[in-house]
């Protein structure tokens, strides 16, 4: 039995809430837990023996993923190929699948894994596949529970408790439906493309009848969740099942959400024994990832839940906790970075503080209330920012190429 896999990577006009981090690196390639966001997906898929072909589907330029694919191909020899399929326009989560259906199904593929790029998860794909085979399902989706307050931000489903059969699905409901949500990870039987074709034909009929007001070029747009899954779940003749994962899961939508995702990936790697031991005499509180090319002085204190990229320089007395430090950053003596993200080429002056507020990995919101105003919990510095000596930046979002000379709290610096 042969399976293929599709990772939906979107495009430059999607994922805008991830700015300013996506200004200098495409969101799917932003490093979390020491590796690119979609590397974690590939690592999980490589453990499924039947998966031979992996397709990245989106509308970025082909050059965006070229170097990444060339690099990771040698990491995953079990794959016959990892290929990027570029949409001619933004086709939606279902439109891209339908457009490239012949390539995805080539080679007598019986099952197709479909995964959104912007999810952080332990990826229990074998368990998902086992349920799919056991139930002889058309679709098996991974589900998890969230708080009632968070539920309306996701695709909510109602399932039959005794069997796990999905009875109803609504994407981002306007009123409370359920606190069981779709994780954005699916296994489809190959016959799903017949259902996607029907959904595509229904959409064309609606366009012809002018039931939808469409922007120019959106005629071929098809949502996997709204146009395909929702109608299927309401059809009692279709076998749609849910696998409820007890393990960690969260979306990576906003820039700040990368910090709790980083913590989850580092903790998993440390627990599994796959986290490389940092080659430094600095004080380390695990879990911590430090790139081998980074220079961390002996007097620094790093961790827990910190990722440090290549060519970073950290001086004596610096303190970093619950943060992501991207490539080529400089953190001067006695500076403090807490609950923050520093994009590439940032410089933090002596005795300065760049800090956010703590967020729980299970907390899906990355904003807090300050003086009755919603502000960023995680401080995010865009690329090439400079914070002068003895300056404090707290709960701020700073766009690239900014020079901070005075203290800031709860600001968006444009």
Curated annotation (Swiss-Prot):
Record-listed E.C. numbers? 2.7.7.13
**Top enzyme category:** transferase
Q: Which SUPFAM superfamilies match?
A: Nucleotide-diphospho-sugar transferases (SSF53448), Trimeric LpxA-like enzymes (SSF51161)
Mind listing the GO molecular function terms for this protein? GTP binding; mannose-1-phosphate guanylyltransferase (GTP) activity
Catalyses which reaction?
A: alpha-D-mannose 1-phosphate + GTP + H(+) = GDP-alpha-D-mannose + diphosphate
**Where is this protein found?**
Cytoplasm; Nucleus
Write out the GO cellular component annotations. Answer: cytoplasm; cytosol; nucleus
Q: Which GO terms describe its biological process?
A: GDP-mannose biosynthetic process
Pathway per its UniProt entry is: Nucleotide-sugar biosynthesis; GDP-alpha-D-mannose biosynthesis; GDP-alpha-D-mannose from alpha-D-mannose 1-phosphate (GTP route): step 1/1
- What keywords is this UniProt entry annotated with? Cytoplasm, GTP-binding, Nucleotide-binding, Nucleotidyltransferase, Nucleus, Transferase
Q: What Pfam families has UniProt attached to this entry?
A: GMPPB_C, NTP_transferase
Gene3D superfamilies tied to this protein: Hexapeptide repeat proteins (2.160.10.10), Spore Coat Polysaccharide Biosynthesis Protein SpsA, Chain A (3.90.550.10)
Which family, according to the similarity comment? Belongs to the transferase hexapeptide repeat family.
Query: Could you identify this protein by its name?
Result: Probable mannose-1-phosphate guanyltransferase
What's the source species for this entry? Schizosaccharomyces pombe (strain 972 / ATCC 24843) (Fission yeast)
Q: What is the lineage of its organism?
A: Eukaryota, Fungi, Dikarya, Ascomycota, Taphrinomycotina
């Amino acid at each position: 039995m042969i399976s293929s896999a599709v990772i939906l990577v979107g495009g430059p006009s999607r994922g805008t809430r991830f700015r300013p981090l996506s200004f200098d690196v495409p969101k799917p390639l932003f490093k979390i837990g020491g590796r690119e966001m979609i590397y974690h997906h590939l690592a999980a898929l490589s453990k499924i023996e039947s998966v031979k072909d992996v397709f990245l589907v989106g509308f970025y330029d082909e050059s965006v993923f070229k170097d990444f694919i060339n690099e990771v191909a040698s990491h995953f020899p079990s794959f016959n190929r990892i290929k990027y399929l570029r949409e001619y326009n933004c086709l939606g989560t279902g439109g891209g699948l339908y457009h490239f259906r012949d390539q995805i199904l080539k080679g007598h593929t019986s099952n197709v894994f479909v995964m959104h790029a912007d999810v952080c998860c332990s990826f229990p794909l074998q368990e998902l596949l086992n349920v799919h085979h056991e139930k002889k399902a058309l679709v098996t989706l991974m589900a998890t529970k969230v708080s009632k307050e968070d539920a309306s931000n996701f695709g909510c489903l109602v399932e039959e408790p005794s069997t796990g059969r999905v009875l109803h699905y609504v994407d981002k409901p306007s009123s409370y439906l359920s606190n069981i949500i779709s994780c954005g990870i699916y296994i489809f039987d190959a016959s799903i493309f017949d259902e996607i074709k029907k959904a595509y034909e229904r959409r064309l009929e609606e366009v012809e009848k002018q039931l939808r007001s469409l922007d120019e070029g959106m005629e071929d747009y098809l949502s996997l969740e709204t146009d395909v899954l929702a109608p299927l779940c309401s059809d009692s003749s279709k076998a749609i099942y849910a696998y409820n994962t007890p393990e960690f899961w969260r979306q990576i939508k906003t820039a700040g959400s990368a910090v709790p995702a980083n913590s989850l990936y580092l903790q998993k790697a440390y627990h599994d024994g796959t986290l490389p031991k940092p080659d430094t005499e600095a004080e380390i509180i695990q879990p911590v990832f430090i790139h081998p090319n980074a220079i961390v002085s002996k007097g620094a204190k790093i961790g827990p839940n910190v990722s440090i990229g290549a060519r970073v320089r950290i001086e004596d007395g610096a303190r970093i906790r619950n943060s992501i430090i991207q490539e080529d950053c400089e953190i001067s003596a006695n500076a403090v970075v807490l609950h923050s993200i520093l994009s590439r080429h940032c410089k933090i002056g002596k005795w300065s503080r760049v800090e956010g507020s703590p967020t729980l990995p299970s907390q899906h919101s990355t904003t807090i209330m300050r003086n009755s105003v919603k502000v960023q919990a995680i401080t995010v510095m865009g690329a090439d920012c400079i914070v002068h000596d003895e300056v404090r930046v707290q709960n701020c979002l700073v766009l690239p190429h900014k020079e901070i000379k005075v203290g800031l709290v709860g600001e968006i610096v444009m």
